[in-house]
UniProtKB/Swiss-Prot annotation:
Key words, A-Z: Electron transport, Flavoprotein, FMN, Transport
Function: Low-potential electron donor to a number of redox enzymes.
Domain Flavodoxin-like per the UniProt entry, residue ranges: 4-145
Protein name as catalogued: Flavodoxin
Domain of life: Bacteria
Keyword flag rRNA processing: no
NCBIfam families (UniProt xref): flav_short (TIGR01753)
GO MF term list: electron transfer activity; FMN binding
Gene3D superfamilies: 3.40.50.360
Length: 146
């Protein structure tokens, strides 16, 4: 059974909704999932997890949130080599179907750090995740559990 830390930052609650759906899917898929806001995760427990799902909504000009999430992610980035990592987040700045540059950049950043990025891409949702987007997040979590 994989032990997965799901760590997120959410300014509006939309990425938190995604995180909760992913945790539900992970548990259905047979993983042991722990959910943390980025400020509540103890970096000292990093090595006790097999896999990580990181969530951050797009901020500014299609980038990771800079005051809480970016410093956290920078602090653990050097430890991602060989780790199975899933990425997710919501966006609002671009129109539906037009966003995602921050996720593409984040995926490439994780790959450059040596992470095994799940499915080679992140799970994104526009604005407040619809029922369809929430179902997609649950399925994403279930697949990541395997």
């Amino acid at each position: 059974m994989a032990k997965v830390a799901v760590i997120f930052w959410s300014g509006t609650g939309h990425t938190e909704t995604m995180a909760r759906c992913i945790v539900e899917g992970l548990n259905v898929g047979g993983a042991k999932a722990d959910l943390f806001s980025v400020m509540d995760f103890d970096v000292g427990t990093f090595d006790s997890y097999d896999r990580f799902a990181f969530g951050c909504s797009a901020a500014g000009s299609e980038e990771l949130e800079s005051s809480e999430f970016e410093p956290f992610f920078t602090s653990i980035e050097g430890r991602l080599s060989g780790k199975k990592v899933a990425l997710f987040g919501s966006y609002e700045w671009a129109g539906e179907g037009e966003g995602g540059e921050w996720m593409v950049n984040w995926v490439e950043r994780c790959k450059a750090a040596g992470a095994d990025v799940f499915e080679g891409k992140g799970e994104i949702a526009y604005d407040d995740p619809s029922e369809e987007a929430q179902a997609s997040c649950k399925a994403f979590g279930e697949r990541f559990a395997r």
